[in-house]
Amino acid sequence: MERSPFLLACILLPLVRGHSLFTCEPITVPRCMKMTYNMTFFPNLMGHYDQGIAAVEMGHFLHLANLECSPNIEMFLCQAFIPTCTEQIHVVLPCRKLCEKIVSDCKKLMDTFGIRWPEELECNRLPHCDDTVPVTSHPHTELSGPQKKSDQVPRDIGFWCPKHLRTSGDQGYRFLGIEQCAPPCPNMYFKSDELDFAKSFIGIVSIFCLCATLFTFLTFLIDVRRFRYPERPIIYYSVCYSIVSLMYFVGFLLGNSTACNKADEKLELGDTVVLGSKNKACSVVFMFLYFFTMAGTVWWVILTITWFLAAGRKWSCEAIEQKAVWFHAVAWGAPGFLTVMLLAMNKVEGDNISGVCFVGLYDLDASRYFVLLPLCLCVFVGLSLLLAGIISLNHVRQVIQHDGRNQEKLKKFMIRIGVFSGLYLVPLVTLLGCYVYELVNRITWEMTWFSDHCHQYRIPCPYQANPKARPELALFMIKYLMTLIVGISAVFWVGSKKTCTEWAGFFKRNRKRDPISESRRVLQESCEFFLKHNSKVKHKKKHGAPGPHRLKVISKSMGTSTGATTNHGTSAMAIADHDYLGQETSTEVHTSPEASVKEGRADRANTPSAKDRDCGESAGPSSKLSGNRNGRESRAGGLKERSNGSEGAPSEGRVSPKSSVPETGLIDCSTSQAASSPEPTSLKGSTSLPVHSASRARKEQGAGSHSDA
């Protein structure tokens, strides 16, 4: 039984946070200085770490001591709050028998004043012992010396978590090395007005970054084929940073509701920062923010890889595109693996400045291995490949130095790559510098905060603290600015005259289409196609291409309405010389034997009637000029003979596969109609393609036949 106080003292030893040795200290509490002992030891039974806090807590029981409800009440309180410490390193605790007597004598007064007996002083927790208290040798002569020494060299017992920062339950919280302790919220370094300014700044920058990255992505959607490999990773890179900027904007809107825990008045807990993955909202924000931050960095590395393959290894776009599956596997797989690992390790931390959740804000090891190390690795690999690619491009530029045009293009491309890489690397390297600076000085900042608030929170103050070692708000603002501005560099790559043209065309296409303008455009495209195709045929014939030439025309419907009334004669102005086109058409007809036979049939079948039929049906009202009966009969006969020879002229501009007569007569027909009649013609008539390959003699013969009729 005699060893029970010593065993209890051994149990209390782990409570000593900053003790390196078990030492006694002189009593400084005035009420207990008249006791038979003058040395004490902390922490005591209630977990008090110094005599000042113990004296304050003991003051709640002074009413009992002043009323002297029990003759031994004052001695018991001093032994409980200021325990005895002997030179033999023996902590003496109050006895159970004395405790039971005090409670029995003072129970009525405690009920009257509403005093609650502390759980730490329950009598059944105290040891059975005698009431004799050992006294240190020379109690009054040795008191002044150690007391002065204590004033000169204060005892550093480490950090004690304030009561309002303690967390309930097993949530895995850890702050300044203390379990179940969380940082305060709002931020422990800055004032409220500084935090408001920082939040507004982050919100504005996130909006700019979000708009820039969305513009890059939407430009890609307008013309997907424009951004092929090796440039395609820029699009995925911009998508990643659009999500990052969106998360910061969400944090700006929500404030600290996601990054901080609300105060609990019942448990006497204040606002604390979220630590761990138990908070679902904070975990979701962390997943998106960390995953896409790392994915964006990896996509930049892949961009440098594709540039190196194209410039240094001379890979084609198709060869690089075949490796796209591996690019996606690395870019999305590695960040996903790190994100899942951090969630499993319970490393999620709330950021009470920006309102988001990230990693490494209070855990220095997590910041070192999950933020700094991946970013430094990506910068090293990407910068190495980028320099290798630029060196290869410079070598190519020296090889083609006599080709002024290509050399100028290559020079502009190199400048473009250099500026884009600089816009990415400079902010990223600055961000790494902020992380390193914060990692080195965070412990000092925390000790300064500890020293500034120890008296306010009634916790022991640190032995040494530099009052000037406080963080600057500008450092954190630069860190958030560099985090977001990295995504804006993608706008530089897509920002060109071609992008403006694509956006202008996109808005123009979305307007309501005019049927007249649309049908004119269709006709103009058809004429341009015929002219281009005939030029190719002439080129082949000039070089002695064997066999007859045939023009196979495929008419394509543009979805326009044939009921609209318009005049398409002016659309033929796109072709400058239709006489040349007619000459080429005549040449093509005579090169084919089958076409010669068909031409003879057409002569016998009254060719002018066929021509009048073609142009007349397409012209609409102008067909009344050939309204006699004989003209109709000859027209019908010509139609019959043409149908027997598989040369029926379709009304919509199509030519039979067996016909070697090209459909180029539309130009002459439409032009002549536009000149002769100002009345608008139907769309059906304007899109028909009559034959314009008859000779001058045939025209004269047709004119004579028409006059006879």
From Swiss-Prot:
Keyword entries, A-Z: Cell membrane, Cytoplasmic vesicle, Developmental protein, Disulfide bond, Endoplasmic reticulum, G-protein coupled receptor, Glycoprotein, Membrane, Neurogenesis, Phosphoprotein, Receptor, Signal, Transducer, Transmembrane, Transmembrane helix, Ubl conjugation, Wnt signaling pathway
Molecular function, one GO term: G protein-coupled receptor activity
Modified residues (Phosphoserine): S656
Signal sequence region: 1-18
Observed effect of gene inactivation: Half of the males without the gene, but not females, display abnormal claw morphology or absent claws compared to wild-type; at the age of 2 to 3 months, the claws disappear or become rudimentary on the hind limbs. FZD3 and FZD6 double knockout embryos have a curled tail, exhibit defects in neural tube and eyelids closure, in the orientation of hair bundles on inner-ear sensory cells and die at birth.
Region (Disordered): 583-709
PTM summary: Ubiquitinated by ZNRF3, leading to its degradation by the proteasome.
GO CC terms in record: apical part of cell; apical plasma membrane; apicolateral plasma membrane; cell surface; ciliary basal body; cytoplasmic vesicle membrane; endoplasmic reticulum membrane; plasma membrane
SMART domains in the cross-refs: FRI, Frizzled
Extracellular-facing ranges: 19-201, 255-284, 346-370, 438-473
Keyword Amino-acid biosynthesis set for record: no
Membrane topology: Multi-pass membrane protein
Transmembrane segments: 202-222, 234-254, 285-305, 325-345, 371-391, 417-437, 474-494
Keyword check for Transmembrane helix: yes
Tissue expression remark: Expressed in both hair cells and supporting cells in the utricle, saccule, cristae and the organ of Corti in the inner ear (at protein level).
Residue ranges, compositional bias (Basic and acidic residues): 596-616, 630-644, 697-709
Residue ranges annotated for the FZ domain, each copy included: 19-132
UniProt cross-references to Pfam families, sorted A to Z: Frizzled, Fz
Gene Ontology terms describing biological process: cell proliferation in midbrain; embryonic nail plate morphogenesis; establishment of body hair planar orientation; establishment of planar polarity; hair follicle development; inner ear morphogenesis; midbrain development; negative regulation of canonical Wnt signaling pathway
Family to which this protein belongs: Belongs to the G-protein coupled receptor Fz/Smo family.
Protein name: Frizzled-6
Organism: Mus musculus
Gene name as annotated: Fzd6
